[in-house]
Amino acid sequence: GLWSKIKEAAKTAGKAAMGFVNEMV
């Protein structure tokens, strides 16, 4: 449902943010 889509988007965004932080460091 909608909630699982939101959770998936949040998970993907979290991974992207982590990768971005790793690139900065």
Curated annotation (Swiss-Prot):
Annotated signal sequence range: none
Family of this protein: Belongs to the frog skin active peptide (FSAP) family. Dermaseptin subfamily.
InterPro entries: Dermaseptin_dom
Main location: secreted
Cell division keyword on record: no
Keywords: Amidation, Amphibian defense peptide, Antibiotic, Antimicrobial, Cytolysis, Hemolysis, Secreted
Superkingdom, natural source: Eukaryota
Gene Ontology annotations for the cellular component aspect, listed alphabetically: extracellular region
Any GO BP: defense response to bacterium
Tissue specificity as recorded in UniProt: Expressed by the skin glands.
Pfam families: DD_K
Segments forming a coiled coil: none
Function description: Antimicrobial peptide, active against the Gram-positive bacterium S.aureus, the Gram-negative bacteria E.coli and P.aeruginosa, and the yeasts C.albicans and P.brasiliensis. Has hemolytic activity (15% hemolysis at 128 ug/ml).
Protein name: Dermaseptin-5
Valine amide modifications at: V25
Cellular localization per UniProt: Secreted
